[in-house]
Amino acid sequence: MAAGSWLKTHGVYRQLARRYPPETRDLCAAAQVLFELFVSAPTLSLADIYGGKMCAALDRQHPRDLYDMRLLFANEGLTPQLRRAFVVYLASHDRPMHELLDPQFKDIAKVYAGEFAGMTREEVPVAALCETRERLVTEIRKNLDADEKRFLVSIKRGEPEWDALGIAHLRELPALQWKLQNIGRMEKGKRKTALEKLQKTLNM
C-alpha cells in the first residue's frame, strides 16, 4: 500500500443465526500480495454472506452493496443454495417482503459520489451499479422456485411451513420467530392486505 494510505473496516453485528455451516477461507492472493501476509480464518458460508448482502442491496441500495452484487454475478452467480439463504434472510427482514422483492429504486448518484467513488481498483460507473440493481431484482423474481415462494407466503400467513426449504434448523432462528410474533400482532385486515401484496409480487 502507498505511504499515507489507510484501510477502513466495518464490524457488523448480525442478529441472524447462520443458515449453513461455516467455511474456512484463505485471504485471496491479491490481498496477500497487497498486505504482505497470509491469513486463514473461519467465515460464514458464501450463501450466508451473500444472502444477507442481497437483502441489504435491495433495502439500502448503497453502491457498496450493489458493487458486491456485481462481483457475485461475475463469479459464482445466484446459486440455488445462495437463493435459499436469501429467502430466509428476506423472511426475517424488518421490511415487508414485497417491498424488497419489488423495490422503489433510489437515486444513488450523490451517495455514489460521496461514499463510493474511488474505493475500488476498477472504476465502476454509477450506471453499471444501477444495471446490477435491476438485474438483481429480475434474477430473484425469475428464479424463486415454488417451495421458496410457498415458504415466504407461509411466514406471511403466520403458519410457517418449516420443511419447505430443506434447511433443518429454521424454526430455531430467533429472527424468524420474532417476525412471526410481529405478524401475529397485526390487525387481520392489514395482514390480509400484506399477504395479498406478497402473493401478487410472487405471481401466485
Language-model region placement:
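Compositionally biased terminal segments of proteins
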Residues: M1-M204
